[in-house]
């Protein structure tokens, strides 16, 4: 494991700048997990530019999301509230209500220039931004369509991660009033499924054999929700859509979707793309893999393509960092890098997210701080994506509304360790039944324990001791000797549900409807 040194977190003794002068550059990716970021875990790949942010600032070791799904996570970010309060529960039925309070609106009202570029995925056009240009839905990796503020759509030629960065740098250089503070939200589609890499990196990592997670062949003993999921690399990863093994006669559930995606490449791009993947496909077809060999082949293809997309992402983060430094903006700018949630890289034999288990609830979070913050190293307190909104508001000198669920991270950025800092986090995932068939569930995570209640067509609990069982393989709920721990966690769960006014505390029927 590679990590930024935790030696001696320091608190600045300097007089801070007038808060109105702090800028905010918020870079968020989709499904980028800490396992594939070398300042967190250097087993797989190197991410030198992302690591630069941590080296120049802080790395949060216990950063989590409140609902591990793209749209709901983004709603939590904007509002500083859990899904039960912001109204965006899932990606299938929810539409975000932009008439509600969001931190960009409050920044805008205080004189900040605000911009949003890239993936929004909230089924509504953004409000609270002086400038925005967003993707429709998930967007496309190649030659993508953008929606502009006039409501029109247009295509852009190129690779999406490059284009979003180009547009962001153009706004920073040419479109903002340089006399005013700003907040720009740079939202990448990368590293979302199905991990289409840029042409220049097609051959990267092709000679790398990635090690299997120790629980890759997990049998899910004692964990009923894990048994019911549909996100298994072995069973559910599509050989065409996900691994690009596309050949004449291909007929998988997602073959037509894959063909639509790659149809966006122009003839020259398609020629290079097909030459690469057709050769891999021919080799794959000649091997006639089955069983565990096929599953492990799919894992290697998944890891290689995911790593290629991350490499492109890291390059583009470096472009933003270089620009900010060249313009002297790094000295009074908070630079944040995070993901909308974590992701499974073969742990438990899975891809995707959704579960409250560690790999998907946890998210990478690094920040490069304005020059008058001297704090460097690791921050170990429990933090959550509902904390971004109050943090940005306090940094801008704006009063944090009382109805926000999150808490400002500014004391932690100043090197403090408040004694009254939260000791537990609340989580609630709603989307079921859905594509990956992860049951609706809620729960709490403390420093040591995690308690989860699954509900819908079944109703049961799981309990994990994260110190003794960090990979969450041994469900302790109902086991002798854990009665006191369970009671304490149940009480804390009830307290948080009341605090956040989650109506699920009044019960849910077998159809998953809150009552």
What role is predicted for each listed range?
Residues 1-455, 459-461, 470-491, 495-498, ...:
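Formylglycine-dependent sulfatase
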Residues 467:
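Residues forming the ATP-binding cleft of Hanks-type serine/threonine protein kinase domains
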């Amino acid at each position: 494991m590679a990590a930024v040194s935790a030696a001696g977190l320091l608190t600045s003794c300097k007089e801070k700048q007038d808060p109105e002068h702090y800028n905010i550059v918020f870079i968020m990716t989709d499904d980028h997990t800490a396992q594939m970021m070398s300042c967190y875990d250097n087993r797989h790949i190197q991410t030198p530019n992302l690591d630069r942010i941590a080296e120049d600032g802080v790395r949060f070791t216990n950063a989590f999301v409140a609902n591990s799904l793209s749209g709901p996570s983004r709603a939590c970010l904007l509002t500083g509230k859990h899904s039960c309060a912001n109204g965006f529960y899932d990606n299938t039925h929810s539409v975000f209500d932009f008439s509600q309070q969001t931190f960009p609106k409050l920044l805008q009202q205080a004189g900040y220039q605000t911009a949003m570029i890239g993936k929004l995925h909230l089924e509504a056009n953004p409000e609270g931004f002086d400038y925005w240009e967003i993707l429709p839905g998930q967007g496309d990796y190649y030659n993508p369509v953008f929606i502009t503020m006039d409501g029109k759509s247009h295509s852009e030629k190129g690779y999406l991660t490059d284009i979003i960065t180009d547009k962001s740098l153009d706004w920073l250089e040419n479109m903002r009033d340089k006399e005013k503070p700003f907040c720009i939200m740079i939202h990448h589609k990368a590293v979302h499924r199905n991990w289409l890499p840029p042409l220049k990196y097609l051959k990267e990592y092709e000679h790398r054999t990635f090690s299997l997670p120790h629980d890759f062949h997990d049998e899910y003993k004692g964990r009923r929700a894990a048994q019911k999921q549909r996100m298994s690399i072995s069973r559910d990863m599509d050989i065409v859509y996900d691994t690009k093994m596309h050949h004449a006669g291909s007929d998988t559930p997602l073959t037509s979707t894959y063909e639509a995606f790659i149809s966006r490449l122009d003839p020259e791009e398609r020629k290079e793309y097909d030459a690469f993947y057709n050769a891999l496909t021919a080799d794959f077809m000649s091997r006639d893999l089955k069983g565990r060999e096929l599953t492990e082949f799919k894992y290697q293809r998944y890891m290689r393509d995911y790593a290629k997309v991350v490499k492109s992402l890291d390059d583009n983060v470096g472009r933003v960092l270089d620009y900010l430094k060249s313009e002297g903006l790094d000295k009074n700018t908070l630079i944040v890098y995070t993901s909308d949630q974590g992701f499974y890289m073969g742990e438990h034999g899975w891809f995707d997210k959704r579960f409250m288990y560690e790999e998907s609830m946890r998210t990478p979070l690094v920040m490069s701080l304005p020059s008058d913050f001297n704090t460097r190293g690791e921050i170990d307190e429990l933090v959550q994506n509902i904390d971004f909104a109050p943090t940005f508001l306090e940094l801008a000198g704006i009063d944090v509304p009382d109805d926000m669920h999150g808490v400002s991270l500014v004391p932690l950025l100043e090197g403090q360790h408040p004694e009254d800092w939260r000791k537990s986090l609340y989580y609630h995932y709603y989307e079921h039944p859905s594509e990956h068939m992860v049951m609706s569930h809620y729960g709490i995570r403390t420093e040591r324990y995690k308690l989860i209640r699954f509900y819908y067509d079944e109703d049961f609990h799981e309990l994990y001791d994260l110190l003794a069982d960090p990979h969450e393989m041994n469900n302790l709920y109902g086991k002798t000797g854990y009665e006191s721990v369970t009671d304490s966690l149940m009480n804390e769960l009830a307290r948080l549900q009341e605090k956040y006014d989650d109506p699920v505390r009044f019960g849910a029927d077998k159809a998953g409807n809150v009552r």
